[in-house]
Amino acid sequence: MLNKRVIPCLDVNNGRVVKGTSFVNLRDAGDPVELAARYYREGADELVFLDISATTEERKTMAEVVEKVSKEVFIPLCVGGGLRSIADMTTLLRAGADKVSVNSAAVSDPDLISRGAEKFGRQCIVVAIDAKREGNSWQVYTHSGKKPTGLDAVEWAMKAEQLGAGEILLTSIDADGKNTGYDNELNREVSSRLNIPVIASGGAGSPEDLYNALDKGQADAVLAASIFHYGRYSIAEVKKYLKSKGLPVRLEN
């Protein structure tokens, strides 16, 4: 069984890490390079950076952030937020990212997934899906959770895999930033249908929440932000807890 991964998520706006609730009410959480270095020391398995302003100007700033981080941190870096083209992907991969994450652009241009996988290898391409529960299913939203697409989240995840995605980053908009646990029904519905890893995101408030996403939700990895940014738990504490519950995780010596 592959190790379960614990991945801090850093939302970057104007070169600073921020955190909100259900994608709004942003507050400052620190310097991206300092936070990344701290998480690396604490035993993070990977880091995800999401550029939430994603203007052209900000893309340059983001590439600079990635370049600095890649000199301090020697674990995989995934970067996303507003990527619309192979050129955008190339900029970030050249700056030092190991993977790129596409969201809104993949919905409007699904072939971008295939083109990216063909050029860089599918292990590089992460498709981020922001899903909101509607009755017994989940709808995909784009543009930072503001725009409904009419797409079913489970079906879209399956299609993304067929198109060449190497991983799915699955965020519950309903749970995001509330620290009350992940939507594990959503996680399980998607994970059980795919042959590629699913990263569960949105709702982490405690080590138990991360365990439930990996166990009940059948996710391969868990993404969390505020529980780490504000020092509520360290990555080492979380991983020791997961290990004590019998999950395979990589512990620092």
Swiss-Prot record:
Pfam families on file: His_biosynth
A cellular component annotation (GO) from this entry:
cytoplasm
Biological process (GO) annotations held by this record are: L-histidine biosynthetic process
Give the main EC class: lyase
Q: Where is the active site?
A: 11, 130
Task: Give GO MF terms, alphabetically.
Answer: imidazoleglycerol-phosphate synthase activity; lyase activity
Keywords, A to Z? Amino-acid biosynthesis, Cytoplasm, Histidine biosynthesis, Lyase
Q: Where in the cell is it found?
A: Cytoplasm
EC assignment: the record states 4.3.2.10
Q: Which pathway does the record list?
A: Amino-acid biosynthesis; L-histidine biosynthesis; L-histidine from 5-phospho-alpha-D-ribose 1-diphosphate: step 5/9
Tagged with keyword Amino-acid biosynthesis = yes
Q: Which reaction does it catalyse?
A: 5-[(5-phospho-1-deoxy-D-ribulos-1-ylimino)methylamino]-1-(5-phospho-beta-D-ribosyl)imidazole-4-carboxamide + L-glutamine = D-erythro-1-(imidazol-4-yl)glycerol 3-phosphate + 5-amino-1-(5-phospho-beta-D-ribosyl)imidazole-4-carboxamide + L-glutamate + H(+)
Q: Which family does it belong to?
A: Belongs to the HisA/HisF family.
Report the function annotation for this chain: IGPS catalyzes the conversion of PRFAR and glutamine to IGP, AICAR and glutamate. The HisF subunit catalyzes the cyclization activity that produces IGP and AICAR from PRFAR using the ammonia provided by the HisH subunit.
> How is the subunit organization of this protein annotated in UniProt?
Heterodimer of HisH and HisF.
Record-given protein name: Imidazole glycerol phosphate synthase subunit HisF
Which source organism?
Dehalococcoides mccartyi (strain ATCC BAA-2100 / JCM 16839 / KCTC 5957 / BAV1)
